[in-house]
Design a protein with these regions (language model features):
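DNA-contacting interfaces and partner/effector-binding or oligomerization modules
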Residues: 1-57, 61
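Short, charged, surface-exposed hinge/linker loops at domain edges
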Residues: 1-3, 43-101, 105-107, 111-116, ...
Length: 140
């Protein structure tokens, strides 16, 4: 099974991402929500492959067989935007030690954080998740 890695960003009002390779060209999609983006990308990829087949373009066997899985690699902007469905910038700020204003700039995509800041955000989200799981487990 072939793994297709999709780089996902938050751009203005949408998640957006794409895949490109010398064998397949480029396929892109956008979506208002995370779920919509994933569905739109899967449909766009299938449509792209169908079009290549109809035009007689050569395809790798995995593409002909549709034997692939999609892995999404989220940029910090997309990660933060998706996380805001479950938490707040204030909570992420407390857990990460980063200023709320910086997080807001990262979430909108206006500023691209350095790797160290992205790692702090990821660790903060993992901590928030673990804390919420511990809280839920205490209700059993």
């Amino acid at each position: 099974m072939q793994k297709i890695v999709i780089n996902v960003e938050w751009c203005g009002l949408n998640y957006s991402g794409g895949y490109g390779s010398p064998d397949l060209g480029v396929c892109v999609a956008t979506g208002d929500t995370w779920e919509e983006f994933k569905q739109e990308f899967a449909e766009a990829m299938d449509f792209h492959l169908e079009g290549m087949e109809e035009h007689g373009d050569p395809l790798p066997q995995w593409a002909v067989d549709r034997d692939y899985e999609i892995e999404y690699k989220m940029a910090t902007s997309a990660l933060l935007h998706r996380a805001l469905k479950y938490t707040t910038l204030e909570a992420i700020s407390r857990a990460s030690g980063l200023r709320r204003s910086a997080l807001k700039s990262y979430a909108t995509g206006d500023v691209c954080p350095r790797d160290a800041q992205s790692e702090k955000i990821l660790q903060a989200l993992k901590k928030i998740s673990a804390d919420l799981q511990e809280l839920a487990d205490s209700m059993k």
